[in-house]
Structures are given as structure tokens and as C-alpha cells.
Amino acid sequence: SYSVTGVQTCALPIFFGQMLASWGQAVSSNLSRQKILFLDTETSGLSGGSGTFAFLIGLGYWNDAEFELTQFFLPHPESENSFLTAFDEFVSNFNCLVTFNGKSFDVPLINSRHTLNRLQPPFPKAEHLDLLHLARRLWRYRLTDRSLTSLEENILHLSRTQEDIPGWMIPQLYLDYLQTQDARPLVNIFYHNEMDILSLAALFLYLGDLLEHPLQQPIQPHGLDWMAIARLYEDTDHLEQAMTLYRASLNAGLPMSFYLDTCRRFAKIYRQQRDWPNAIALWQTAAENGDPLSCIELAKYYEHQVGDLDQALSWTNQAIQQTKFSDPELTKRLNRLKQKISGKTTVFKE
């Protein structure tokens, strides 16, 4: 076991954010921080096949006011059973797991190695928060690369020293070690794993604070980040927070396609609340910027809520002009409105 202690995190907001827990669905928001375990593995292969095993498991956790890191290293594959047994004993007191792609890679690999060694899986009841999925959701609109190292650079503004090595080199370095027994190159692997754990913990803390206090960040997030968080709020039925962030993202400036979509999403909430003036203002803003879907919403409003068929017809015509392809539904709506205006009584369903 290799341990690094005394990594201070006291100055950071240490809590399990309610929104972070809400997105995690099964994850409780009242977990003790001492029960949270950050995990990352380095393996003998990158594919995760039956012959792949973890030779280094990094674990991060809070011990009172300090964040500590312990690394379990497997010096020889034939010692895997005792390696896993020691690991199991160490993690038995934790009940929440935080990983980055751990649901798809690290945990299934660890479980399969336990099965091959006739051991019980180490996390049968632990709650699991995989930050990769949340990172993809929040930053897919402006970051093409959502790897942990990319998030370190672009979101956390952290940098690694020259000790670090690319992840793809790690399996071969370990295999070289097994042949030569020269452990000196492994120092870079230990550093890489240590930084992954520390970055994972930093990302966890940042996300918890960002999701609960998105407008109170020391570095103002990108407008696309506010938009993405607003969608997350909306999907978890935190509508007031969603509306606040939709407004902030529109004021911050968005690429036009995202701007129009945000106007529609924001207006939809107002429509559900029957706050027609605010909904109309957003639809009109989007319509003025060439959005046919908002024109259709305005046509529906004027026909069904106000009974102003001329306005409904006008907005339908504008929707047709802004649509780049022939839409039978719009043509049907146009003809129906013309018939109603001309006094015909034929009724068509929406």
C-alpha cells in the first residue's frame, strides 16, 4: 500500500450537493463525507477483456480535515488474491463510490477479477456516482473532449508536471516491469494515478458547488454551461432554478441555435404556468431571429387562447416562410385557419 496524506482541502466547499445527489438518483444527499470513496484504476490492458486486471488501485477519501490518498499496487499477478483481499478490507467502511467512467470500466473490471479469484464483489450496496456522465451532459456543447485531463485543463484550470504520462502507455510500462523488475518507470504511473484521484475529487467538489450555486462562481461559467445546468434543473423539476439560469444564459450570449432552443424551453415553462406575457415575449424574440417553431407557438396562442384568427394566420404564414422544407402540418394549419376566417364550420383536429 502506498499512501500520500496531508493533501489539504479544507478551503474548498466540502459537501455532497443536493443537485449532484439529485442527478445521481439513487445517491443520498445526506451522506457523510468520510463515507465517500474516490476510485481510479490502472490496468494491464485498455480493453477490459477477460485477461485484463488492475495492478494499481488509487483511493481518495477524507480523514477529518485532510484528504488522503492510498494506492494499492500489485507487484506480481500471482499475488492478485491477497491484493484484492487487502483492498476489500480497506474499502469496507465506505458506502458511496465516486469514479470517472467507473460504471463502465473500473467497477466491472474489479468485480470480474473478484469473481475469478472466488471473492465477493467489494461494493454490493455502495451508491455510485460516475462523474463522466454528468460531465458529458454539462460540457458536451462546448468541449469536444470531456476526458478527465481535458476537464482539468478547461474547467478546473489545473496542470500536471512532466512526471505524468499518457494513459495508453501505462499497460506496456507495467508489462515491462514484470519482465525486468525495474520499478523506476512505475513512478510516473503512480503520479498519473494520484493526479487522477485528486482531479476526480476536485471535479466532485466543483460540480457540487456549481450545481447548487451556479451564479455565484468566482470565475463566471460560459453561457453554454448555464444553459446545460438549466436543462438539468428542468429535467429534475427544479423549475424556478431552471428559469433563473435560462435567463442568465440568454443574457450571457449563446450561439444562435442554442439561443433559439433556450428561448423555446424557457417559454415552455412560462406556458405551463400560464404566464402568457413572458411566454409570448420569448416566442417573439425567437421568431424575430428566424425560428419557425416559435412562430407556430404564437399561432397556437392567438388561435386558442385569444381567438385572434388573423394573428394566428399571420404567424402561420411566417412559420411557413421560415421553414426550409415543405411541412404538410403547416399547410394543413394554414388551410384550416383560412376556412375558419372565411366562415366555414368544418372542424379539424390539431
Question: Where are the predicted features?
Answer:
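Single conserved hydrophobic/aromatic residue that forms the stacking wall/gate
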Residues: 2-10
